[in-house]
Amino acid sequence: MAQQRRGGNRRRRKVDFIAANHIEYIDYKDTDLLKRFISERGKILPRRVSGTSAKNQRRLTIAIKRARIMGLLPFVTED
């Protein structure tokens, strides 16, 4: 009998960008950092896509929402 290989489709674990770069405070004025976690349509990327921890995702969400209210980031992008 021929042997079959198992496994194969192993996905690489996503790394928390904020923790990896030792960012302690997520500033709402740092739009370059915040844009990494926003989709092309202007939506906040979920944890399963961005790889952030739950704590950093909450901080990120608050910072993005503040930046939107202050006019630094758009609520939605136009096509």
Curated annotation (Swiss-Prot):
Keyword tags: Ribonucleoprotein, Ribosomal protein, RNA-binding, rRNA-binding
Single GO biological process annotation from the record: translation
Gene Ontology CC annotations of this record: cytosolic small ribosomal subunit
One Pfam family here: Ribosomal_S18
Family annotation (Gene3D superfamilies): Ribosomal protein S18 (4.10.640.10)
MF term (GO), any: structural constituent of ribosome
Superkingdom assignment: Bacteria
InterPro entries: Ribosomal_bS18, Ribosomal_bS18_CS, Ribosomal_bS18_sf
Family, per entry: Belongs to the bacterial ribosomal protein bS18 family.
Subunit structure: Part of the 30S ribosomal subunit. Forms a tight heterodimer with protein bS6.
Known role: Binds as a heterodimer with protein bS6 to the central domain of the 16S rRNA, where it helps stabilize the platform of the 30S subunit.
UniProt protein name: Small ribosomal subunit protein bS18
Annotated source species: Latilactobacillus sakei subsp. sakei (strain 23K)
